[in-house]
Amino acid sequence: MREGIHPAYAPVVFRDRAANHAFLTRSTMTSEKTVEWTDGHTYPVVDVEISNVSHPFYTGTARVLDTAGRVERFERRYGKGS
């Protein structure tokens, strides 16, 4: 790889404030804020609004919004799937 054209790739802590969960990974993102991780090292921390811990799809709390009865109409026409 050519020198000087690639962004810095380093360990970063991503923190989901809604779920009170944090995870350490590598990223090109950085931050002025830092946090001390469980291994005793200090890493930049990036606060995110939603992650796999708090997203409804991954937590199993997702709901199908059916405003016009389309799911019921489909099930009446073609029957329920097995």
From Swiss-Prot:
GO terms for molecular function: structural constituent of ribosome. One of its GO terms (cellular component) is ribonucleoprotein complex. PROSITE patterns: RIBOSOMAL_L31 (PS01143). Keywords: Ribonucleoprotein, Ribosomal protein. InterPro entries: Ribosomal_bL28/bL31-like_sf, Ribosomal_bL31, Ribosomal_bL31_B, Ribosomal_bL31_sf. It holds the Pfam family Ribosomal_L31. One of its GO terms (biological process) is translation. Belongs to the bacterial ribosomal protein bL31 family. Type B subfamily. Part of the 50S ribosomal subunit. NCBIfam families: L31, PRK01678.1. This is Large ribosomal subunit protein bL31B-2. It comes from Streptomyces avermitilis (strain ATCC 31267 / DSM 46492 / JCM 5070 / NBRC 14893 / NCIMB 12804 / NRRL 8165 / MA-4680). The gene is rpmE2-2.
